[in-house]
């Protein structure tokens, strides 16, 4: 390999081993999902139901109000450790000022595994660049690439909202008149997955609530 300065070495690495490689990962992600589809879907719903049960318990203990927000957040600090962990939080009307923590974790490794495997290979390739590329560079590349995989995860989360909305645990959980589910990064940018609002004046059976679902 010809001698390169740091910028040239980094550009060479990106062009040869990063920029388009994520496209090849799509087939791997699809295969991961189809191989374990039922288990993957069940694990997400189980995590969400566990959150609802915890929020219901805290409400019964007088420690938390009616739930108004649910956040599903990628933990960037875990990505560095090759773990695709999402934290799922339930907040009452106090939002981030809600003092009673109500959170569970869920793993999206089935989406991120190809990324982690690629980054392991990049770590080995850096020796080809005569110390111009560092482990810190690889970690930064990983964080940038993670955005693509996070977006794929968000699409999966959206697809599972109808199942979650129909779950008994969510129905039993005390909710504000308007409740919104978000996905994003922890206490950072996020997008709405689903919003449900209590319907005023709708005919319901005794003990039931009527909700208007929107996305």
Model-based region annotation:
Residues 1-21, 144-215:
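Acidic, proline/glycine-rich low-complexity IDRs
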Residues 32, 36-43, 141, 145-153:
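Conserved aromatic-histidine-acidic binding/catalytic patches
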Residues 17-67:
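Short N-terminal edge-element motif at the start of the domain
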Residues 61-119:
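Aromatic- and glycine-enriched beta-alpha-beta binding-site module
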Residues 44, 72, 88, 157, ...:
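Generic structural hydrophobic/aromatic packing signal, biased to beta-strands
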Residues 54-57, 77-81, 163:
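Amphipathic alpha-helical interaction surfaces
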Residues 102-144:
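Low-complexity, serine/threonine/proline-enriched polar segments
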Residues 1-39, 108-122:
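Short, amphipathic alpha-helical segments
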């Amino acid at each position: 390999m010809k001698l390169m300065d740091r910028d040239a070495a980094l550009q060479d690495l990106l062009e040869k081993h990063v920029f388009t490689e994520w496209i090849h990962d799509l087939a791997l992600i699809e295969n991961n999902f189809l191989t374990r589809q039922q288990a993957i879907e069940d694990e997400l719903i189980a995590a969400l139901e566990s959150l609802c049960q915890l929020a219901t318990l805290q409400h019964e203990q007088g420690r938390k109000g009616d739930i108004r927000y649910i956040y599903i957040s990628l933990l960037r600090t875990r990505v560095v450790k090759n773990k695709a962990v999402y934290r799922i939080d339930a907040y009452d009307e106090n939002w981030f000022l809600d003092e009673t923590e109500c959170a569970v974790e869920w793993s999206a490794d089935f989406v991120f595994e190809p990324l982690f495997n690629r980054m392991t290979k990049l770590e080995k390739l850096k020796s080809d660049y005569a110390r111009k590329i560092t482990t810190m560079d690889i970690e930064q590349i990983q964080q940038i690439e993670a955005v693509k995989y996070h977006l794929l995860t968000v699409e999966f989360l959206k697809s599972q909202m109808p199942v979650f909305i129909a779950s008994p645990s969510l129905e039993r959980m005390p909710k504000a008149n308007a409740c919104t589910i978000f996905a994003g990064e922890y206490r950072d940018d996020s997008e709405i997955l689903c919003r449900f609002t209590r319907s005023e004046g709708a005919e319901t059976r005794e003990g039931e609530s009527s909700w208007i679902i929107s996305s």
